[in-house]
Amino acid sequence: MFCELMLCKLVLIKKNIGKDFKKDFKKDEIMFSKSTIAIGRFAPTPSGRMHIGNMVAMLAAWLSAKSQGGHMLLRLEDLDIARMPKDASARVIDDLKWAGLDWVGEPTYQHERTEIYQEALESLESLQDDDGNSLIYPCFCSRSDIRAIAAPQEGDGFIRYPGTCRNLRKTSEGLAQIEMRLQNNQQHSLRLAVPSADSPQANVSFIDAIFGAQSFNINRDLGDMVIRRADGVFSYQLAVVVDDVLSGVNDIVRGRDLLRSAALQIWIGELLEKSGFFAAHGVHYVRPQFAHLPLIDNAQGDRLAKSKHSLDVGALREAGWSAERMIGYCMYLLGYKKHGQNQPVDMSAADALALFESFDTPWGSVRANLADKSVPFLD
């Protein structure tokens, strides 16, 4: 009885807070059938002016959808709107228009969609793990707490949450501690409990159109992920799945740093399908086609960052770069070289699409060199 009362109280408190591959790629293996409309998306985070790496990803996404007779949507991933620079979204939109990368419909803004994310969260709360607990639980750990007890994986800086607060639910003492902290209004995030490492549900596999067969154990490789931050901001991992499925996106092109996230997002999509969330909105979850790109680094081999104004598109435009020069350079970084030339060639977005479509195997030039690319003569 104690546990039942505590669980009910925990759910009510959370709801109230929320209110406020194969080596041989064939064309038909990685492209949609003619009866399926490819819908891609530009999904930039307007945390600053886009850099050239962002433009490479935007162009690649546009090429993928357009080459399949589809179209693009534009979604501004501004969940943490308080930290977004003023006019950053407008500048992103202007840069895309300037480059000739078009989309259909009006842009959508994630900060305006918190109600639908809350609904998705509540759907996940209704699901239980193997121990009969809700898949959503409160986490009182700070980032420094987690860094102190967990090591980054694979040298990419990713830190797997060790499950400290999840383990509190395993004992009566831990449950009492959770209840006390909630009663004291202790700040906490909400996490999504992944299956145990030895559970078949923890293994997620998919074919990436560029990097090939991928397989992740979402327990060992990712761990329990934050679904809503302590300040009430919903996580990227939840919002992106909700928005992609509800808007019909089925063609996702982005950087390889999100390969790991693809597995988690597939699992979240399947959970929301199981919960009935998507059916309630007249859609069903279907796995999208993924293509993850090598990253773009600067001359020192460091990843480009908006915060460092790395190869800022605005600065390049002010320096006299034309849209054709930008598109040509992005195609060069993707490995698509016009007429065998080994230097970037200016071209329009339409020219880039024709060049992309001239290759027999989609993404063949990208797969020929999966190493991250550097742009030394632009730094």
Residue ranges and their predicted role:
Residues I30-D156, D257, S261-Y285, G340-M347:
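N-terminal Rossmann-like or analogous alpha/beta NTP/dinucleotide-binding catalytic cores
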Residues F2, L7-S47, M72, Q177-Q183, ...:
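Non-catalytic terminal extensions that flank enzyme cores
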Residues D80-A90, N298-Q300, A354-G364:
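Short, mixed-charge aromatic SLiMs
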Residues H51, P85, S142, R169-G174, ...:
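Helix N-cap and loop-to-helix transition residues
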Residues D95, A120, I149, T164, ...:
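Residues that form generic nucleotide/phosphate-binding pockets
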Residues C3, C139-C141, C165:
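Disulfide-bonded cysteines in secreted/extracellular proteins and peptides
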